[in-house]
Amino acid sequence: MQNFTFRNPTKLIFGRGQIEQLKEEVPKYGKKVLLVYGGGSIKRNGLYDEVMSLLTDIGAEVVELPGVEPNPRLSTVKKGVDICRREGIEFLLAVGGGSVIDCTKAIAAGAKFDGDPWEFITKKATVTEALPFGTVLTLAATGSEMNAGSVITNWETKEKYGWGSPVTFPQFSILDPTYTMTVPKDHTVYGIVDMMSHVFEQYFHHTPNTPLQDRMCEAVLKTVIEAAPKLVDDLENYELRETIMYSGTIALNGFLQMGVRGDWATHDIEHAVSAVYDIPHAGGLAILFPNWMKHVLDENVSRFAQLAVRVFDVDPTGKTERDVALEGIERLRAFWSSLGAPSRLADYGIGEENLELMADKAMAFGEFGRFKTLNRDDVLAILRASL
């Protein structure tokens, strides 16, 4: 394995009723709070009233930023930065899923940055400080509640990029599975695809001697595969929501990537697709990932065969290693389809008309990917296979 240094300062507060911990945690950082949330689901399920009541109890002065988009936009980040500066915000509280948290990270950094936030999002500048923030998670998917990463879309230029900084870890994150029980089936499935994709990005590498990392990844995948079909048939099952929520956090909080270097090419391609078409991120991943896998298979057939046998229970008897690997990829595709995830870009009405544009967007920073370095022809081939 590779040398590594691990650090994750986020305090994770997990379980039923843990929302009460807001009264303990928020006062550590100040009274002037920016409450960031999305399209209004937290008002429909009662969480908004609960949070506001707790913040009132501790004497917090709350300013609100509602309406964060599913693919959070630079314009919303800038709006939040302006509020922070104008109102003297001391602490931000993100109540929502990964998009709300990602947006909050960019606002927290932007409020302390002398310049356009797009500069650090596109890695042309570095942030050295950020306002403190915490999260209350309502959707198990991205892992943003316990990492420093964020993805922001510039809708005007049709660009979407991931970024991160050591200063953009949440101070704390409250994870009560109860608040995910009203998430509808389609978004539940998107979350499942997203967390599995995060594991795949860290599983596909060429680093030797990573038996524990491999088994940890495989354990998360097996756990999700066992729980997911039950959950989509029983959306209000607390134990299943609990399992999926914890899995999503573990999938991208740094535990699985210690000593390895993941790939992340599929995410980069999907960012280009959803920058142009504004489709759900995980929907794009469900379509692209099996096709990326088939495209890069011959870079390390053994690793794909290992996944097929250990995670998808492919029987290798009498089969070539490559056939085992291919069967594993098709079992993944079939599993996601069985949950109701999309399998073709056509499912979103996407055809060939913008393939070249999406390839150009994906190649904005040059060739990418570590498992196999992808050039423009590779990206186009994966996109065409995904139509």
Swiss-Prot record:
Q: Name one Pfam family in it.
A: ADH_Fe_C
Q: Summarize the thermal behavior of the activity.
A: Optimum temperature is 60 degrees Celsius.
Which amino acids does the record list as binding NAD(+)?
G98, S99, V100, I101, D102, T138, L139, A140, A141
Q: Does the keyword Lipid metabolism apply?
A: no
Q: Which UniProt keywords apply?
A: NAD, Oxidoreductase
Is rRNA processing one of the keywords? Answer: no
For this protein, the record's InterPro entries field holds: ADH_Fe/GldA, ADH_Fe_C, ADH_Fe_CS, BDH-like
Please give the positions of the paired cysteines in each disulfide bond.
none
Task: List the GO terms this entry assigns under cellular component, sorted alphabetically.
Answer: cytosol
**Reactions catalysed according to its record:** a long-chain primary fatty alcohol + 2 NAD(+) + H2O = a long-chain fatty acid + 2 NADH + 3 H(+)
Q: How does activity depend on pH?
A: Optimum pH is 8.0.
One MF annotation (Gene Ontology) recorded for this entry: long-chain-alcohol dehydrogenase activity
Q: What is its EC number?
A: 1.1.1.192
Recorded hits in PROSITE patterns, A to Z, give: ADH_IRON_1 (PS00913), ADH_IRON_2 (PS00060)
SUPFAM superfamilies recorded? Dehydroquinate synthase-like
Q: What does this protein do?
A: Long-chain alkyl alcohol dehydrogenase that can oxidize a broad range of alkyl alcohols from methanol to 1-triacontanol (C1 to C30) as well as 1,3-propanediol and acetaldehyde. Oxidizes isopropyl alcohol, isoamylol, acetone, octanal and decanal. The best substrate is 1-octanol.
| Assembly and oligomerization | Homodimer.
Name the family. Belongs to the iron-containing alcohol dehydrogenase family.
Q: What is this protein called?
A: Long-chain-alcohol dehydrogenase 2
Organism per entry: Geobacillus thermodenitrificans (strain NG80-2)
Origin organism lineage: Bacteria, Bacillati, Bacillota, Bacilli, Bacillales
